[in-house]
UniProtKB/Swiss-Prot annotation:
Subcellular location: Cytoplasm
Pfam short name (any one): tRNA-synt_1g
InterPro entries found in the cross-reference section: aa-tRNA-synth_I_CS, aa-tRNA-synth_Ia, Leu-tRNA-ligase, Leu_tRNA-synth_edit, M/V/L/I-tRNA-synth_anticd-bd, Methionyl/Leucyl_tRNA_Synth, Rossmann-like_a/b/a_fold, tRNAsynth_Ia_anticodon-bd
Organism: Streptococcus pneumoniae (strain 70585)
UniProt keyword Secreted, yes or no: no
GO biological process: leucyl-tRNA aminoacylation
UniProt protein name: Leucine--tRNA ligase
Sequence motif: 'KMSKS' region, positions: 610-614
Catalyzed reactions: tRNA(Leu) + L-leucine + ATP = L-leucyl-tRNA(Leu) + AMP + diphosphate
GO CC terms in record: cytosol
Length: 833
């Protein structure tokens, strides 16, 4: 057979690997370790798409490579299986979310196995398994004991259609929910919060120690949002009330001409005048209908209402009006801001909208035309006049502290983590609320608190989860007869994914989250590969939980993931009409190399776009594996371009990768393999071993494959192939195309055993040296010939070769040679007359 029969060979080796537990994690204590982690998937009903295997193939290449280098390799897979989609589907269809999830997992696992990934399935985890979420609940109880999990009445992003509150991060810029695109309104509710802010400084500082891209680190830094400034206290005129604002520019306090409170600020009702009461109440209601993102959108029209009250500016005693406006959030900072319209664009727009005074306190701009937001020397600022920013801040903070109306302060943009969901399909929060007003955590001996099975998973309608409907589960009685009620909120999907990488290390431990010695052996994760869309939330939450567990003495490292790599997106093919509107692929026909709308006949422009069901451009890996084989898909996705680039899917590229594998198959199966080395491939073979090794180490898989192609081209020009080079080449291609490599290994090694643990080939540096070099021959200073000669010839040998060259002989025919200058490895210069 002259081609790679993937339909026969791939299932054969997948069966072999499963039967022999080929990829069981090594436990030889004398070997170094390598922990390669994929971001585990949510098992959706749609199954895998071709974007999933890109990251999975990258970690699989590294895992196979490291096994061959003698490492114990931990390369696991599992399922992030709680979450809204399964529950929504269950409500829509009447199916049990657990059954639906189990079916989806089975499908995902089938698809993953068909791609030949070397996972240790003995370590599979599932966040919905009570044996797993027992430890998710255990971590929560520890957070609760340490005061890091607490209840608070907070305004939440309520989504009526989903029947739950969602985190700020799950609200889209247009004010709708990320899941489903439903309207989001603000509503005060009792919620569980995790005090991630207690770890803000460590989460920020420890980024410096990580091998992550600067862009991802910057996203986390910006999310944490550290600001150094001052808290300033303003008294409310004619009352004993006061409020505090945080500002990074206390030096501009002389320019504060009004203050703004969040509509939800606790002082608003107390200070609002009778005349303004109705307007304030109306405005508060309107603000409650908007999400935080919609409220803080810089582009939106400025709205607000005066409360009728005045604050006293603490540095000059001036009375300045107190307004409420929805761009100030009660959950951010102190829920109050001092407005300096001359030097802040949003304040300037607000002042212009409502005809409020604008006082310049930094020279350099025209504040009637626009806010001046650069630095300058202080003016109109009494004792700060003439000072620069740094000196003025130091002086004003000292003044405020002396007067008792302010102090230096560090704040963070980071908010505490809203940890409750009013849904059924999640981990039950292990807390009991007693009728005597106390609350306690479910003791460890009673964990897991198992999610009860029920068909009634519709929201309760009271703002509580469907668990509130299950009286038998809900109501409990203590030994002393005191009655209690279980917490009805469940945890968010982020919970199980915040520590799953730890459970892979010891997945069957019933006594503890994981054994300390095993955690010491395997942590930190050596490389974590996944999409950049998780750059902030998942990674920040996982780092928070890891640091908490470090403080408890559970884990031995400060950070979970030493190296992080974000693969690019695989884009689909899309088509746009003259308006730029996208056209679904089933409405497109190809004629003479161009693309046309089937219904209108309009010629369309082809362009890459994110794969989506609506555009009908999603590529199913099952179809690719059926037609081309798993190894083709793996090689193609790695050869498309740099791993971190977003690149459009191409059927032609897929066919090219398949042709390459057929050429590899023919090379090994058809070429005469011999025990004697004639040296013809010494240089290209050793170059290939060196290049592929170095490029796998640096995740440059596309250039590694390109070098494998160079070797195949060179080998095909020879009549025979040296057996050690054949073996070495098969080992080099094995991480990329493992099924093909296993099959070809049997051809040349005939051991009957897997290639997986055969020692990785090495290169001979001496074989990389060029044996021949090019020299130039000059006659009267002009280049007349270029010759390939053996390296390091003597002057005499160079001269002899140059003078014997036919082209040179023709040039000097009939002329007298005055002298010949030879420079070894460079040139021969012939002087004639």
């Amino acid at each position: 057979m002259s081609f790679y029969n993937h339909k026969e060979i791939e299932p054969k080796w997948q069966g072999y690997w499963a039967e022999h537990h080929t990829f069981k994690t090594g436990t030889d204590a004398s070997k170094p370790k390598f922990y390669a982690l994929d971001m585990f998937p949510y098992p959706s009903g749609a199954g895998l798409h071709v974007g999933h295997p890109e990251g999975y193939t990258a970690t699989d290449i590294l895992s196979r490579y490291k096994r061959a280098q003698g490492y114990n390799v931990l390369h696991p897979m599992g399922w992030d299986a709680f979450g809204l989609p399964a529950e929504q589907y269950a409500m829509d269809t009447g199916n049990d979310p657990a059954e639906f999830t189990a079916e989806n997992i089975a499908n995902f696992k089938r698809q993953i196995n068909a791609l030949g990934f070397s996972y240790d399935w003995d370590r599979e985890v599932n966040t919905t398994d009570p044996n797993y979420y027992k430890w998710t609940q255990w971590i929560f109880t520890k957070l609760y004991e340490k005061g890091l999990a607490y209840e608070a009445e907070v305004p939440v992003n309520w989504v009526e259609e989903l029947g739950t509150a969602i985190a700020n991060e799950e609200v889209l810029p247009d004010g709708t929910s990320e899941r489903g695109g439903y309207p989001v309104v603000r509503k005060p509710m009792r919620q569980w919060m995790l005090k991630i802010t207690a770890y803000a400084e460590r989460l920020l500082n420890d980024l410096d120690e990580l091998d992550w891209s600067e862009s991802i680190k910057d996203m986390q830094r910006n999310w944490i949002g550290k600001s150094t400034g001052a808290n300033v206290t303003f008294k409310v005129k004619g009352t004993d009330k006061e409020f505090t604002v945080f500002t990074t520019r206390p030096d501009t306090l002389f320019g504060a001409t009004f203050t703004v409170l969040a509509p939800e600020h606790e002082l608003v009702d107390a200070i609002t005048s009778t005349e303004q009461a109705e307007a304030v109440a109306d405005y508060k209601h309107q603000a409650s209908l908007k999400s935080d993102l919609a409220r803080t959108d810089l582009a939106k029209e400025k709205t607000g209402v005066w409360t009728g009250a005045y604050a006293i500016n603490p540095v000059n005693g001036k009375e300045i009006p107190i307004w409420i406006a929805d761009y100030v959030l009660a959950s951010y900072g102190t829920g109050a801001v001092m407005a300096v319209p001359a030097h802040d664009q949003r304040d300037w727009e607000f002042a212009k909208q409502f005809d409020l005074p604008i006082v310049e306190v930094l020279e350099g701009g025209n504040v009637e035309e626009a806010a001046y937001t650069e630095d300058g020397l202080h003016v109109n600022s009494d004792f700060l006049d003439g000072l620069n920013k740094e000196d003025a801040i130091a002086k004003i903070v000292a003044c405020l502290e002396e007067k008792g109306c302010g102090q230096e302060k560090v704040t963070y943009r980071l908010r505490d983590w809203l940890f409750s969901r009013q849904r059924y399909w999640g981990e039950p929060i292990p807390i009991i609320h007693w009728e005597d007003g106390t609350s306690t955590a479910v003791p460890e001996s009673e964990l897991p608190l198992v999610l009860p099975v029920t068909k009634d998973i519709r929201p309760s309608g009271t703002g509580e989860s469907p668990l509130a409907n299950l009286t038998d589960w809900l109501e409990v009685t203590r030994e002393d007869g005191v009655k209690g009620r279980r917490e009805t909120n469940t945890m968010p999907q982020w919970a199980g994914s915040s520590w799953y990488y730890l459970r892979y290390i010891d997945p069957h431990n019933t006594e503890k989250l994981a054994d300390e010695d095993l955690l010491k052996q395997w942590l930190p994760v050596d490389i974590y590969v996944g999409g950049a869309e998780h750059a902030v939330l998942h990674l920040l939450y996982a780092r928070f939980w890891h640091k908490f567990l470090y403080d408890l003495g559970v884990v031995p490292t400060k950070e979970p993931f030493q190296k992080l790599f974000n693969q690019g997106m695989i884009l689909g093919t899309s088509y746009r009409d003259h308006r730029g509107a996208l056209v679904a692929t089933d409405k497109v026909e190809k004629r003479d190399g161009s693309f046309f709308h089937v219904e209108t006949g309009e010629e369309l422009e082809q362009a890459p776009a994110k794969m989506s069901k609506s555009l009908k451009n999603v590529v199913n890996p099952d179809d690719v594996v059926e037609q081309y084989g798993a190894d083709t898909l793996r090689v193609y996705e790695m050869f498309m371009g740099p791993l971190d680039a977003s690149i459009a899917w191409s059927e032609e590229g897929l066919e090219g990768s398949r042709k390459f594998l057929d050429r590899v198959y023919r090379l090994i199966r058809s070429k005469e393999i011999v025990a004697e080395n004639n040296g013809a491939l010494d240089k290209v073979y050793n170059e290939t071993v060196k290049a592929v090794t170095e490029q796998i180490d640096s995740l440059k898989f596309n250039t590694a494959i390109a070098q494998l192609m160079v070797f195949v081209n060179a080998a095909n020009k020879e009549d025979k192939l040296y057996v050690d080079y054949a073996k070495g080449f098969i080992q080099l291609i094995a991480p990329f195309a493992p099924h093909l490599a296993e099959e070809l290994w049997q051809t040349v090694a005939a051991t009957g055993e897997s290639i997986s643990y055969v020692t990785w080939p090495t290169w001979d540096e001496s074989k990389l040296v060029e044996d021949e070099i090019e020299i130039v021959v000059q006659i009267k200073g002009k280049v007349r010939a270029k010759l390939m000669v053996a390296k390091d010839l003597s002057r005499e040998e160079l001269q002899e070769i140059a003078l014997a060259d036919e082209k040179v002989k023709a040039e000097i025919d009939g002329k007298e040679i005055v002298k010949v200058i030879s420079v070894p490895n460079k040139l021969v210069n012939i002087v004639v007359k």
